[in-house]
Amino acid sequence: MKDFLTYLSTAPVITAIWLGITAGILIEFNRFFPDLLFHPL
Protein backbone atom coordinates (compact mmCIF):
# COMPACT_ATOMS: atom_id res chain seq x y z
CA MET A 1 0.00 0.00 0.00
CA LYS A 2 2.91 2.35 0.78
CA ASP A 3 4.38 1.78 -2.69
CA PHE A 4 0.98 2.47 -4.27
CA LEU A 5 0.71 5.79 -2.43
CA THR A 6 4.25 6.66 -3.49
CA TYR A 7 3.28 5.88 -7.10
CA LEU A 8 0.17 8.08 -6.83
CA SER A 9 2.21 10.98 -5.49
CA THR A 10 4.53 11.13 -8.51
CA ALA A 11 4.19 14.13 -10.80
CA PRO A 12 3.03 12.36 -14.04
CA VAL A 13 0.21 10.59 -12.20
CA ILE A 14 -0.93 13.80 -10.49
CA THR A 15 -0.73 15.64 -13.82
CA ALA A 16 -2.78 12.98 -15.63
CA ILE A 17 -5.47 12.99 -12.91
CA TRP A 18 -5.57 16.81 -12.85
CA LEU A 19 -5.86 17.04 -16.65
CA GLY A 20 -8.61 14.41 -16.63
CA ILE A 21 -10.59 16.33 -14.01
CA THR A 22 -10.10 19.62 -15.87
CA ALA A 23 -11.15 18.06 -19.18
CA GLY A 24 -14.24 16.55 -17.54
CA ILE A 25 -15.26 19.91 -16.09
CA LEU A 26 -14.79 21.64 -19.46
CA ILE A 27 -16.71 18.91 -21.31
CA GLU A 28 -19.63 19.09 -18.89
CA PHE A 29 -19.64 22.90 -18.95
CA ASN A 30 -19.59 22.86 -22.75
CA ARG A 31 -22.42 20.31 -22.79
CA PHE A 32 -24.73 22.54 -20.73
CA PHE A 33 -23.55 25.91 -22.09
CA PRO A 34 -22.27 25.22 -25.63
CA ASP A 35 -21.91 28.88 -26.66
CA LEU A 36 -20.12 30.26 -23.58
CA LEU A 37 -16.83 28.37 -23.82
CA PHE A 38 -15.52 30.21 -26.89
CA HIS A 39 -17.32 33.50 -26.39
CA PRO A 40 -16.05 36.36 -28.58
CA LEU A 41 -14.64 39.22 -26.54
UniProtKB/Swiss-Prot annotation:
It is a single-pass membrane protein. Keywords: Membrane, Photosynthesis, Photosystem I, Thylakoid, Transmembrane, Transmembrane helix. Pfam families: PSI_PsaJ (PF01701). It is found in: Cellular thylakoid membrane. InterPro entries: PSI_PsaJ, PSI_PsaJ_sf. GO terms for biological process: photosynthesis. The chain crosses the membrane at residues 7-27. One of its GO terms (cellular component) is plasma membrane-derived thylakoid membrane. May help in the organization of the PsaE and PsaF subunits. Belongs to the PsaJ family. This is Photosystem I reaction center subunit IX. The gene is psaJ.
